[in-house]
């Protein structure tokens, strides 16, 4: 695929000349410098040809020939980098993609919010409890969640620990996939132990049986195995928030004559850091990766037109994904102006719905949660609005886990506020559990099946 030449007015550190939000303040500048220099010497976590391959797949999704499934933890934990948990996360994403393949009848692009999702933006730099004020928890590659002075102090060494865990995670995922874990002949490999008790299990098994029958039919017809049915492509993604970390993993690839962020395949910019004059937009405009930006109620038409111009000046297919997040109550009013603004520019973008962040609320018990009905309502409205405006919703962005947690209420099991304390494990935002995630995939398949 032809690529645009590198920018003459950009460098991996040019963002430092711009106002940059959500960056931790480190007491020991020398220790920070040592950590960043070490990161810059370490091998990349991903490689440029994987990134280029993903850009091509996202271009197909922009054209309506594929659908993006983008999901994983709100914030990964260094302590959760263990084989069983990674397997469960991969299983639920594979199960969802199987349902979507069956329902949508098109390729599914599988991207995990994993192998690097260790930094989180916060609404305040500090947190106060019982009269004690400490730095806010910003994710495990910055500081630690326990509310004590030592844990909350930003530690440069955690940048290296985050890199190590990200590399271990993605290496394990690759080994599983290359070893046949994702073989379409054996979807039973993906079953979660506790899934058999789910109200949606039989519906899922029916999808598996239908796909298995189709696969065997085509193999019988062809007289040989279906090409590439023994593995799937899987990509990693995280919010490119901590720019010193991202800068350290940005490398110049001579054969492409471009700079790539080799810490992940698809980095994204969050709503809080997407200012046109900010450091994040400056950094992202210069890397060759496909990139995504979260947009919501605060984005107006003029801003969005300028954003797509700055981030994708060459109108490169597969380059730019826009992830909209409004909430069920606001999407019908807010989304049309964004669609019309982008349509007027002629830039190719992939529209993706994040039905999670706009639907977060707090219960009287103090738990943050999301109502499953609100999540589904935002998704359904997103599909309808895009159709009404001659656009296409090409993907979904979800915070989810393969664990049997109780963080979002509702779903087939009818979880209530009273269930939240039973298995609430997230340190930041509530996630869909395996059952709710699969139910979302089934709803998308029903909404879009046959279109």
What residues fall within each predicted segment?
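Long, contiguous, compositionally biased segments that the model treats as domain-scale units
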Residues: 1-143
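Active-site-facing alpha/beta catalytic cores
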Residues: 75-76, 80-327, 367-370, 378, ...
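Non-transmembrane, aqueous-exposed alpha-helical and coiled segments at domain scale
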Residues: 319-350, 357-406
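Short, well-ordered loop/turn elements at secondary-structure boundaries
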Residues: 63, 263, 286-288, 345-347, ...
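Short glycine-enriched loops at secondary-structure junctions
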Residues: 115, 356-357
């Amino acid at each position: 695929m032809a690529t645009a030449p590198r920018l003459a007015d950009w460098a991996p550190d040019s963002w430092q000349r711009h106002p940059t939000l959500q960056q931790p303040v480190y007491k020991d500048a020398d220790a920070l410098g040592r950590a960043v220099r070490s990161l810059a010497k370490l091998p990349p976590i991903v490689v440029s040809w994987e990134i280029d391959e993903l850009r091509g797949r996202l271009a197909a999704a922009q054209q309506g020939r594929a659908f993006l499934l983008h999901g994983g933890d709100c914030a990964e934990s260094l302590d959760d980098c263990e084989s069983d948990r990674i397997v469960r996360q991969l299983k639920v994403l594979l199960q969802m993609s199987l349902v979507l393949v069956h329902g949508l009848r098109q390729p599914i692009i599988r991207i995990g919010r994993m192998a690097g999702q260790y930094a989180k933006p916060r609404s305040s730099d500090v947190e106060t409890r019982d009269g004690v004020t400490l730095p806010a928890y910003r994710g495990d590659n910055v500081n630690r969640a326990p509310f004590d002075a030592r844990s909350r102090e930003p530690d440069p060494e955690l940048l290296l620990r985050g890199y190590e865990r990200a590399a271990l995670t993605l290496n394990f995922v690759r080994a599983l996939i290359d070893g046949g874990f994702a073989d379409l002949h054996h979807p039973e490999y993906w079953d979660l132990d506790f899934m058999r008790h789910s109200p949606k299990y039989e519906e899922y098994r029916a999808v598996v049986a239908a796909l298995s029958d189709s696969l065997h039919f085509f193999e019988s017809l062809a007289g040989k195995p279906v090409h590439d049915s023994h593995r799937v492509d899987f990509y990693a993604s995280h919010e490119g928030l901590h720019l010193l970390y991202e800068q350290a993993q940005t490398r110049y690839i001579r054969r492409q004559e471009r700079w790539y962020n080799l810490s992940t395949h698809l980095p994204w910019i969050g709503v809080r850091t997407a200012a046109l004059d900010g450091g994040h937009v400056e950094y992202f405009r210069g890397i060759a990766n496909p990139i995504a930006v979260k947009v919501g109620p605060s984005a107006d038409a003029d801003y969005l037109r300028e954003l797509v111009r700055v981030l994708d000046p060459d109108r490169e297919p597969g380059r730019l994904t826009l992830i909209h997040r409004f909430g069920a109550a606001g999407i019908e009013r807010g989304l049309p102006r964004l669609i019309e603004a982008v349509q007027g520019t002629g830039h190719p973008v992939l529209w993706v719905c994040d039905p999670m962040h706009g639907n977060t609320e707090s219960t009287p018990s103090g738990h943050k949660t999301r109502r499953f009905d609100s999540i589904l309502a935002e998704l359904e409205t997103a599909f309808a609005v895009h159709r009404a405006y001659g656009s296409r919703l090409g993907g979904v962005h979800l915070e989810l886990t393969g664990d049997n947690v109780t963080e979002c209420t509702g779903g087939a099991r009818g979880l209530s506020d009273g269930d939240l304390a039973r298995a609430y494990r997230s340190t930041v935002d509530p996630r869909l559990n395996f059952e709710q995630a699969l139910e979302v995939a089934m709803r998308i398949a029903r909404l879009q099946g046959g279109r």
